[in-house]
Amino acid sequence: MVLVLINGRPLSINWADKFVPAILEAWYPGSQGGTAIAEALFGDYNPGGKLTVTFPKTVGQIPFNFPAKPASQVDGGQTPGVKGNQSRINGPLYPFGYGLSYTTFEYSNLQLSSPVITDKEPVTVTCKIKNTGTRSGDEVVQLYTRDVVSSVTTYEKNLRGFERVHLEPGETKEVSFQLLPRDFQLLNKDNHWVVEPGMFQIMIGASSEDIRLKKGLEIRAYGQASANEIIESDPRDFISASKNKSISSMWLTETIPLPGKVKKGNTYPSNWQRTPK
C-alpha cells in the first residue's frame, strides 16, 4: 500500500506514518500529475525531492517552522539548541529538507578553503557525494550554518545553499558552495546587520536534521592586530573593548576595561583603543 498526498500544506499524518509502508508527497501536481505519480510509483522515475516545510507530529506543535530559534519546549532527554527542532517536544514527524529515494547516498570529505577567515572574506565549502545504491538517482545536498555564540538569539540552523546532484550507481561527485560574509550576518540589538567574530559550524546534510558532515569555522574581525604590538607590562595600561568584541575567544557582553596583564600573543580588533597612549 502506498499513500499519495495531494495537498498544499503540511498535514498531521501520524497514523499513516505508523501503518502505511510508503507515502508519496505529490502536492498539487497539475494536469499531468497522474502520469508523474504513476511513473514514480512504478519505478520509471526515481524521486529526489525534499520537503520545503516541516511536518509536525501533532497540531499542538504548530507553529513549527524552519528555521527556528531555541524553544522552551524541551524533551527531557535533549539539550536545548543542540539538535535543532529535535530539542522540542517529540521533534518533527518529517523535518525541513527531508525526502527519500529508491537509492542511497554517502557523504564524505568535507573541506573548507580556510578554517579561519575575516568578516570581509568568502569561504568555499566542498564535499563528496557517492551513490551507494543500485539505481541512478538525484540527491539534494544541503548546506547549513550555525552561530555558536552570539549577542542576540539566532536561528539554530540556517540553510545557506543546496545543490541537486545526479549520480549513477557507484558514481562519486564533488559538490561546492561559496559562503559570503552576508551569510554570517545577524540583526543586532541596534537593528544593524553585522558579522560578529567567533565560531560557526558548517554542516552538510540530507535534511535539516540528518546532518552527515560538520566542521568549525572561525571568523575574525577585519584588520585584527596582534596584542604583541601594544601590550606592555605597565598595569596602568588597558584596552577599552567595545560591546561584543572578543579576545582569547571569550565574548564580552558589555564595555569592559581589560588590564594590561593580557598575555602577549592574544589578538584584538584594530579599532580597539589603548590608554594611556
What are these regions (language model features)?
Residues 229-272:
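Compositionally biased low-complexity segments at domain edges in trafficked proteins
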Residues 180-227:
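Terminal connector regions
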Residues 6-138, 144, 164, 169, ...:
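Secreted, periplasmic, or luminal enzymes acting at the cell surface/secretory milieu
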Residues 132-134, 148-150, 182-184, 209:
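Short coil/turn motifs at secondary-structure junctions
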Residues 1-2:
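Hydrophobic anchor at the start of a short beta-strand
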Residues 122-124, 172-176, 212-214:
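Intrinsic-disorder/low-complexity, polar/charged segments enriched in Ser/Thr/Lys/Arg/Asp/Glu/Gln
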Residues 151-187:
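Intrinsically disordered, low-complexity Pro/Gly/Ser/Thr-rich segments with frequent PxxP/GP/PP motifs
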Residues 134-151, 157-159:
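Short acidic, flexible loop segments centered on an aromatic residue
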